[in-house]
Amino acid sequence: MPRKYLESRLEDLQIELDAPALERLEGFLSLLMRWNRAYNLTAARDVETLIDRHLLDSLVVRRYLPAGALADVGSGAGFPGLVLALIEPDRSVTLIDSNGKKTRFLRQCATELGLHRVQVRQARMEALDDGDFAVVTARAVAPLATLIPGTRGLLAPDGALLALKGERIQEELAELPEALVEALDVHELPAIAGQGRACLVACRAAVHL
């Protein structure tokens, strides 16, 4: 496992993690590489690509997290929700995905890496309305016009949605009905080698949704 490569990339982005968090991240990357050979969870085929294309922007999200319970929709191979649980193991995290092989992988990671505050649910986000989460995260799940109403049932009344977005963000914002949101901010994320423009959209849904 390229520990030195991971540490150098974290240093580039001024991300500081303690030794236990680094060990959990290494364990996660090892599990993902092993499962990926059999189940094709992600297109990345080497650890360096996983780090650059998936892990780093998930870690950057931490800077914008409010306190409280977190739900991650469309968790897939664990980005960003499982990654955030790995570096904040005391936070309550619920990982949501409709794909059975991906939820099995997420449960295996939670078990092997000792993430006792992680729950995994196999479901579509639109089907869940029993949430009281302080924050919902999403990465490459759906356009904002779909994502905001689709996650409203998961959020506490003052909860926030944090959505990782890329090159099409201006198009998505132009297509977003103003009535859907009460507040919205776009945070430019640090440039990561091998990626295009990335940003984090933080918003609160309108109360009438």
UniProtKB/Swiss-Prot annotation:
Protein species of origin: Halorhodospira halophila (strain DSM 244 / SL1)
UniProt superkingdom: Bacteria
Record keywords: Cytoplasm, Methyltransferase, rRNA processing, S-adenosyl-L-methionine, Transferase
One Pfam family from the record: GidB
GO cellular component: cytosol
Disulfide cross-links: none
Binding site for S-adenosyl-L-methionine: 74, 79, 139
EC number(s) from the headed UniProt entry: 2.1.1.170
Subcellular localization: Cytoplasm
Chief place of localization: cytoplasm
Keyword Transferase: yes
InterPro entries the record matches: rRNA_ssu_MeTfrase_G, SAM-dependent_MTases_sf
Keyword ATP-binding found: no
One Gene Ontology MF term: rRNA (guanine-N7-)-methyltransferase activity
Enzymatic class: transferase
Function statement: Specifically methylates the N7 position of guanine in position 527 of 16S rRNA.
HAMAP family for the chain: 16SrRNA_methyltr_G (MF_00074)
Family: Belongs to the methyltransferase superfamily. RNA methyltransferase RsmG family.
Protein name: Ribosomal RNA small subunit methyltransferase G
NCBIfam families, per the entry: rsmG_gidB
The reaction(s) this protein catalyses: guanosine(527) in 16S rRNA + S-adenosyl-L-methionine = N(7)-methylguanosine(527) in 16S rRNA + S-adenosyl-L-homocysteine
